[in-house]
Amino acid sequence: RQRQMCIRDRYVIESYGLIVNKTLLEKAGYTVDDIKSFDDLKKVADDIQARKDELGVKGAFTSAGMDGSSDWRFKTHLANLPIYYEYQADGIDDTDAIKGTYLDNYKNVFDLYITDSTCDGAELSAKTADDSRNEFINGDAVFYQNGTWEYAELSKTFSDDELAMIPIYFGVDDENEGLATGTENYWCVNKNASDEDVQATLDFMNWCVTSEAGTKSMSEDMGFTIPFKTAVAPTNVFVKQDAEYTAAGLTPVSWNFTTMPSEEWKNGLGTALTLYAAGSGSWDDVVSAFVDNWATEKALSE
């Protein structure tokens, strides 16, 4: 649009949700079939948290780390859900003035993450993506918000039968909600590069999605779903589960990251969430960072 930017074909499709250690969940007396709504999730998570010593875990959820390696999970991925539901309710796909209709739901989920956690909220500012992943791998927590891209690492420790991914139930349309599935990944070629380099780049991109080695690497090694006719069937259990949710009639939550105003908006939201989790900021500050900064940053991008 105004920035004269063209986004055409995505080269990968991914999903995110709540990754579940089914073995630990069953040890607590539940299965994934017991969790079909936000209320169900809260009931199960609260119970696990109350019985964490008995169950041998440190918390229901892995740490919601807010350092730079991890905060995108909450200032972007989790923040996508209130945006998605507002867009759906208003019949739009972008806006210069987000209303924050579903920020109470955002709060409910984030509150669950920081109260039923492996650590105190004041510690989250220094918690990393590796911390969160390792807590899950070590059996310290039952739930771990992340995506299909985590499969390659988790499969080194867990069998497919021990893992599941469920939607981040938001308390809006839980009975119809699937995983958050989409992309923000596109290949671009610099037109100012030499003809030789442009052609070499195009040849490599073609190799990635047509050759046996390229498609295997992208599908199996990287855990991607690649939307090309030459794609091999995924071995990633989370990708398979996403397909099962869709086949069952559940609606994938679309990715609306490209409509977020700017990185500055995300960073401001991340800071407000971090302070809120630590008890030194209010939820009103989070709402302001979400709603007021959206309008400001959208205006600056025009």
What is each stretch, according to the model?
Residues V44-D47, D90-A126:
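Glycine-centered hinge/linker elements that transmit conformational signals in sensory
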Residues R8-Y11, Y16, K42-T95, A141:
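Extracytoplasmic/periplasmic solute-binding protein
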Residues G65-G68, I83-N108, K156-T157, F170-L179, ...:
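Short, solvent-exposed loop/beta-turn-alpha elements that line the ligand-binding surface or hinge
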Residues K36-K42, E123-N138:
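Short helix-initiation/N-cap motifs at beta->coil->alpha
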Residues Q2-I7:
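Short, small-residue-biased leader/transition segments that mark boundaries at the very start
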Residues E26, A50, A213, V232-P234, ...:
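Conserved C-terminal helix/tail region of periplasmic/extracytoplasmic solute-binding proteins
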Residues A28, K156-D221:
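Extracytoplasmic/periplasmic substrate-recognition and gating elements
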